[in-house]
């Protein structure tokens, strides 16, 4: 008793301490105690539910610590980083009541990277290392805390008493044994004074090991310092006496408390309950619980959970059930219970954890079928014995708590690479009839494959064999073969270990692997000796790759002959002719044009050898190969392929061609006899139009003009429009109007007129046609609106800004189309094509201000993100947020980050507090991903929206499965099934049917019952009849999908029409080809084009589609084909876009193809509609010559053009900037040196300063400042070329992030600062880049020179200063920027 009386006397001798409010009471912090709730209650009353805060709220008050007055708040530093860390940890605790090690590690590493972690950050990290980490063992938690302490101290973090107290709390929660005296000495050495909280926790530390004497010493310190003794101290003393074996003294502490004027509260009673629980004294526990129930006190669920911990850890799990009966299972206590379960599993008390798990109300919730995943995952992590874990799984399933517990446990075991456990679980699943699939073993194989662990691979293959699972080809090729020196050694090792399957799978994988490595001799030997039937389709892709990697044509031929003649490989149907034909087609199709050209002789030899081997192909496939060879610009090979055609199967049907000669003769005869010729004339005109014979049709019209009728004119107008003949089309329209002013063309012909006139720059004439459509009430349907879009889009792709604006304004103002987002797309596209992102954004914003639509904002955002235009992104987001709401802004940003692959940023956006699902927006992006075959993007969308509030997860997975169906990826589809089960998702019937269809198509077992359609019988009865109305496709459907940019749907309609032998109009196919090319879907576009060419006589792409085709061909390095496409378009009198022609010329220049550039120059000569500058040819021909190392010739040509009296380009317009820039970018140093010499010579000898000035400016722009400075010193006249320098400044100021370039230019030529245009451009660029220092320097320089500054300059400077919170040293001009821009423009245009 003496040990008890000593502290009691001190307590009685001290002044009576008023009872602390419960909100300020600290938890007892006894060993192993769960984090206690901060209790807020009226005296003696039970708190309201909303006033009870979990320890999660501690994170919300770390910065202020208002509820912890005994620990003075340290000075706050690194606010934004701290807020970020606080948010991540706080969100985790709010959501789950715990923190994972991974999350804490990330926050810790991020904090360390900040360089100077703040005091609050350190405190936050330390407090997270205790009971908030239930998934870590006690020792690991403490080790983590020490790691954080040491590292932050190294980084310069200054610790105060709050940090030492936090460390003490972690020690207590983690039951860490340490010396309190040494801890005090450590604080003293750091010159840190302990406070009341320090002493309280040191007392708790002594008491946790039953050291009452040590606790008494600390109490003595507190008494001498006149520190109040709180309930927390008494609670610790209860624990100390109990662990010292003196339960009587422990119980007497309550009496001592009352004598000290402190009424024992819940914490004290809980400490006493834990003391009895550690002794296994259930009777005393019950007595105390009854006593508390009769008093004004109460226990919360987490208090009962703590008692369960005490019983369990002391070895008395038999009493847990009696405590569980006391728990009310309030919703807010569920995270505490789950964390208790994790803690028990960590402490190897899985049985008790399982008992608590089954007692939770969620386990009895019939709507939940996957509760307990967290328990199973942690059991896997903590290496719970397989037998016990499998038993848990079965009991959870039988209790209908977790319907897929074994599958989920297998998933966790595979993730954790726990082979033995995975095997045991798979055996349990197999015994229950669950199919074990090959890809389940891939996570186990990949670890061994990375380390070349042959034995590990063999062990996994043995397990697969035991499980009755045969590896597929992917398994062997991706995971097994890479571990061996050769396939033969792999076969030998597997045979030795009896892992070689009896099926053909290994052999097929062997062939594929040898083909991939180009070992054709091994393939031939295998195919000759193979005794099993193989599918040619299973070999085709690998053989193509093998052929391309081997140049042995004899082996090519022998393998092809073997495949053609051996029944094992080309079974019927379709037979060897079709199978080998498709192989040849795919072989050539897989090559680029340059590869085909390089292998032309080898391919010719190959085809000749096949002919000698009597290998045949069908005529249809021959035509396809011809098209490929023609596109690859090697038509010479066509005759070599023709000899392979199977002549016996050629369709010998004769086709008769109806000519116009008979009609023309009849017409002349009727005219001579004086008979009416109206009808036959119209018939002849229509026939010539169908033959696309425009020249002849116009001649006939001229000859019989007096007899022409309305129908003939209409047909001729349409014909001229198709042939891009704007002049004759307009003349015919005028004659049409004179013939009958009231006559009306059909909508398609009006639209065609608008299109051809707009394309040829006759915008006003096109607008007049639009006005006539309005005046004559021409019916405008969806097809016409779609055509309007294509007209505008074609102009946009050509870069014709004014054309797009004027035509769009006319169409909308006249009411011919509503100002929808789609019809407004080209207003933005025209700027995107020019890569003018600021203008594109402004155009989109202007559309919203005028029409309340925001076209292409997604594409604009994606471009801005790719370019890193943070200011413009912020501007866009501010506008969207203001006009459409913050939620719309977040979704726009989320989708843009996803599209550009910035998944981390996308995750941050979608985890924004308060964001909820918007089904329409989500479905829009899903459809976009499906249409563009963006598998990874859609997968990330589904993954990131898992926790999104009100997100229809079934719909998300349904979209993902739709994409997998297109790609035929059954493995990923099967993984989706597992993922849906993990999420406890009940899929809709359509989702199940879609998944089942994917698995069945790939001959895989379906692991669930497939719902049957109630109308199945009706559907099957219709399947044998002709296509139903719902199956019939129309051109309107195709054009509608094209208008909506649904390229995938439009292409599917085309395929369906192809099967039904439905042929659309030329314009429909041109539209579809253009759409597919705009989506970079080159292969499908060519399929559509080839079909149209074979089904519509004289089919040609329209101008816009031809331009897109040229760009696509250039992008794929099909330069010869692109040149042919350009020639064909020009032969049809089409006007390709300036962009398409320029891209082709530039690509040819980089390849050194001077001849082709000169050919293009001749082809476009005189075509002013293309608006191609002569400098495009001059620059690119010179560049091509330099690429061919003909530098002297290139320079001589340039000098000759500049010095010649017959100048083709005036000196002031002879710009070589592009040439200089490409030479610098391509690092062509000899060429750059000689160009520099040439430029200086022209300047010094001929006073031609533009070349040297252009070179100087390109050196500045590319960052070669020293070279630019040296050039300026050698040629000082550069500084006098004010007009050239001003134009450069103007153009540069319009580009983002170019302020440093202008700054460098002004440093090199200081006198430019006083040029009003230059300093205005400089200020504009400084403001755009937020370069305050440079802006200030420029302003101060100009004011010092007493320069008169215009209002626009001052307005820009004032806006910059206000943005950064600095005072404006003058009166800010009051009007808008637009006002001053207009004012300055007028002043410069009218200098008077």
UniProtKB/Swiss-Prot annotation:
Family matches, as Gene3D superfamilies: Tetratricopeptide repeat domain
Cystines in this chain: none
N6-acetyllysine found at: 151, 186, 291, 462, 749
Cell location: Mitochondrion; Nucleus; Nucleus, Nucleoplasm; Nucleus inner membrane
A GO molecular function held by the record: RNA binding
Keywords: Acetylation, Autophagy, DNA-binding, Membrane, Mitochondrion, mRNA transport, Nucleus, Phosphoprotein, Repeat, RNA-binding, Transcription, Transcription regulation, Transit peptide, Transport
Keyword Mitochondrion recorded: yes
InterPro entries: LRP130, Pentatricopeptide_rpt, PROP1-like_PPR_dom, TPR-like_helical_dom_sf
Any single GO CC term annotated in Swiss-Prot or TrEMBL for this entry: nuclear inner membrane
Residues with Phosphoserine modification: 1025-1026, 1028, 1137
Induction: Induced by NGF in nociceptors.
Entry keyword DNA-binding: yes
Ranges: PPR repeats: 125-159, 160-194, 195-229, 230-264, 265-299, 300-334, 402-436, 437-471, 677-708, 709-745, 746-783, 784-820, 821-856, 953-987, 1030-1064, 1065-1101, 1102-1136, 1137-1173, 1174-1208, 1315-1349
Domain of life: Eukaryota
GO biological process: autophagy; mitochondrial RNA catabolic process; mRNA transport; negative regulation of mitochondrial RNA catabolic process; regulation of mitochondrial translation
Targeting presequence: 1-77
Tissue expression profile of the protein: Widely expressed. Expressed in liver, brain and a subset of small diameter sensory neurons in the dorsal root ganglion (at protein level).
Quaternary state and interactors: Component of mRNP complexes associated with HNRPA1. Component of the complex, at least composed of LRPPRC, BECN1 and BCL2; the interactions prevent BECN1 from forming an autophagy-inducing complex with PIK3C3. Interacts with CECR2, HEBP2, MAP1S, UXT, PPARGC1A and FOXO1. Interacts (via N-terminus) with EIF4E; the interaction promotes association of EIF4E with 4ESE-containing mRNAs. Interacts with exportin XPO1/CRM1; interacts both alone and in complex with EIF4E and 4ESE-containing mRNAs to form an EIF4E-dependent mRNA export complex.
PANTHER family: LEUCINE-RICH PPR MOTIF-CONTAINING PROTEIN, MITOCHONDRIAL
Purpose: May play a role in RNA metabolism in both nuclei and mitochondria. In the nucleus binds to HNRPA1-associated poly(A) mRNAs and is part of nmRNP complexes at late stages of mRNA maturation which are possibly associated with nuclear mRNA export. Positively modulates nuclear export of mRNAs containing the EIF4E sensitivity element (4ESE) by binding simultaneously to both EIF4E and the 4ESE and acting as a platform for assembly for the RNA export complex. Also binds to exportin XPO1/CRM1 to engage the nuclear pore and traffic the bound mRNAs to the cytoplasm.
Protein name per Swiss-Prot or TrEMBL: Leucine-rich PPR motif-containing protein, mitochondrial
Organism: Rattus norvegicus (Rat)
